[in-house]
Amino acid sequence: MRSGVIAKKVGMTRLFMEDGKQVPVTVLQLDKLQVVAQRTAEKDGYSAVQLGAGTAKAKRTTKAMRGHFAAASVEPKRKVAEFRVAPENLINVGEEITADHYFEGQYVDVSGTSIGKGFAGAMKRHNFGGLRASHGVSISHRSHGSTGQCQDPGKVFKGKKMAGHMGAARVTTQNLQVVRTDADRGLIMIKGAVPGSKGGWVTIKDAVKKPVPENVILPAALKSAAEEAKRLAEEAAAAAEAEAKAAEEAAAAEAAAAEEAALKQAEAQIEAEKKEGDE
């Protein structure tokens, strides 16, 4: 089990695939997602990483949280969340996670706070059919109807589907597919809709009802590792370029030496022929 990520919902758009099909996607952005703290079994009784996303003003952050972020040597964060991980998948404090944490085709579970609808009736809240439009029904066309029984039990059971507050609740949508990622801009594009409004925070985890892919990055796709790989690649490219340049210079020097030797040989041959003519 590895860490999930915190992302901001940017909005929805569509992508055109190579076969011409268009896929509706939700764009999620990773905004300076860093590890703020660790939870270990020895100290806390469980293994987890605490992540922080976004940047908050210091004056809008409590003194306790300012101290918490200062201990991790990170900027104050707007959103903080914990993710349970296996002990071997703990991430060092201060590390930044990139959008390459997920790959195209992978299935994920996305959790967020749904858009609040206020007080809603049973037809909107629970998809009830409502009462008859006529034939004796007046005023109560969108009513949910009877809610109880007779004198026994003489009450409304808990959990009865009735009118009430709708939305603004924690919702998880499972088995959503990642269509595309953009590590440079920190974007993850997921097929379909995810809970929440534009600008809201969501959490993304590996799908629990799908097998874990073999090619996932453990413990996470870290910016430091990507920068190190990029640096090594640049050094290897520079070394290869220098080696090619040295080989080219050596070949040019060898060709120049061969040309000079051929010129000297030609001059010597001309001198020899001239001497033979004088004799």
From Swiss-Prot:
The modification N5-methylglutamine is found at Q151. Keywords: Methylation, Ribonucleoprotein, Ribosomal protein, RNA-binding, rRNA-binding. It comes from the Bacteria. Methylated by PrmB. The gene is rplC. HAMAP family: Ribosomal_uL3_B. One of the primary rRNA binding proteins, it binds directly near the 3'-end of the 23S rRNA, where it nucleates assembly of the 50S subunit. It comes from Dinoroseobacter shibae (strain DSM 16493 / NCIMB 14021 / DFL 12). Belongs to the universal ribosomal protein uL3 family. One of its GO terms (cellular component) is cytosolic large ribosomal subunit. Part of the 50S ribosomal subunit. Forms a cluster with proteins L14 and L19. GO terms for biological process: translation. This is Large ribosomal subunit protein uL3. One of its GO terms (molecular function) is structural constituent of ribosome.
